[in-house]
Amino acid sequence: EMSRGLGDVYKRQVKDGQIWQQPVREIAQYHKNPCHYEHAEIDGETALSGICGRTMDLTVTMDEQDFNVFSIQLAADEEYETAFTYHKGTGILEIDRTYCGVTKDVVCVRKIKIADPKGLKKMRFILDRQSIELFINDGQQVATTAVCTPLEAEGIRFFSDKKMYITVEKYDIVL
């Protein structure tokens, strides 16, 4: 059941001595309501029509572009969000769930050094109501985070400090 998370639905393989992980192909059988953007312009904070929800398979691909900071805010509304912010100059991806609804004293910010020397090119998110799985650069790195955000917070916002273009592929996951 997806409400328990997707920890057992990874396909693992070894590449160059490292474990890479991806969601299993079978997840595609639950894909509904596709929404696709090719070269969507992001300049400042941007929302894309049809890109929202809390149970989905969302892939964002970035070409080499002139930006310093790119961010995706998931499970978002006026009060809540979980932000995934890439700082291109340092190669750091910051996962910030400060505003995800956490009420206890927990670590809310994690930082990941992107392993690929070419930087962050692709992010695939699997959202499952109260958790987010992120597959970085086709599974070279993986991050999981729990979110306590009310289920009504289903917005997705993109941000870039300079004009850039992304490709977005989104499917609702319906069991």
Segments from the language model and where they lie:
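Short, aromatic/His-centered strand-loop micro-motif at the edge of beta-sheets
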Residues: 101-122
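Single conserved hydrophobic/aromatic residue that forms the stacking wall/gate
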Residues: 1-10
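Short tryptophan-centered beta-strand motifs in secreted/extracellular beta-sheet-rich domains
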Residues: 58-60, 119-136
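Secretory/extracellular carbohydrate-interaction modules
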Residues: 40-102
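Ligand-recognition surfaces built from glycine- and aromatic
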Residues: 151-175
